[in-house]
């Protein structure tokens, strides 16, 4: 018998201006729409495009809103902060990253679980434009998280439709990238 544990911290490490805010927000909203209490935090040193940015979601069945030390799941999408991001993962936690290129040995930790998703490789045949591939990688990791965490896919696709309502040309490719 499996049981769901709705008490964890997930942090998204991204590059500011990469379109990650939309995907990360959809992740939190999807959990909330499923009736799971969440608290979100943006952590960024600057609003300058290209600099690091983090988005943290605390999932707490008891409704705790404050931050707590450590990260249970790290979605590491920023090469510049990769080492720091891995260091913040609690023992027994998870690292989700794009394994289209092999993970360097200096980033390996024996006390965490690595989940490599070949995001860039998957997007290459789907989207010819490099800028599109860069933007859709965020939606692709959202789809991977939905599968890993048993988030209802209909909730995620509904979030995409809501997010891009009135911009119908964006809905289909975003759902395809999931």
Where are these regions (language model features)?
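Active-site cofactor/cluster-binding pocket
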Residues: 1-178
């Amino acid at each position: 018998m499996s049981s769901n544990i709705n008490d964890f911290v997930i942090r998204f490490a991204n590059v500011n201006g990469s379109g990650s805010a939309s995907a990360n927000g959809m992740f939190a909203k999807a959990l909330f729409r499923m009736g799971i209490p969440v608290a979100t935090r943006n952590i960024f040193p600057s609003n300058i495009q290209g600099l690091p940015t983090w988005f943290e979601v605390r999932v707490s069945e008891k409704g705790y809103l404050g931050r707590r030390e450590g990260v249970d799941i790290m979605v590491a999408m920023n090469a510049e902060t990769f080492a720091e991001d891995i260091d913040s993962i609690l023992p027994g936690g998870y690292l989700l990253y794009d394994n289209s290129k092999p993970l360097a040995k200096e980033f390996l930790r024996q006390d965490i679980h690595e989940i490599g998703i070949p995001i860039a490789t998957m997007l290459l045949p789907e989207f010819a434009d490099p800028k599109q591939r860069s933007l859709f990688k965020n939606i692709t990791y959202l789809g991977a998280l939905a599968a890993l965490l048993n988030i209802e896919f209909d909730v995620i696709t509904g979030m995409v439709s809501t997010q891009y309502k009135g911009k119908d040309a964006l809905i289909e490719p975003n759902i395809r990238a999931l």
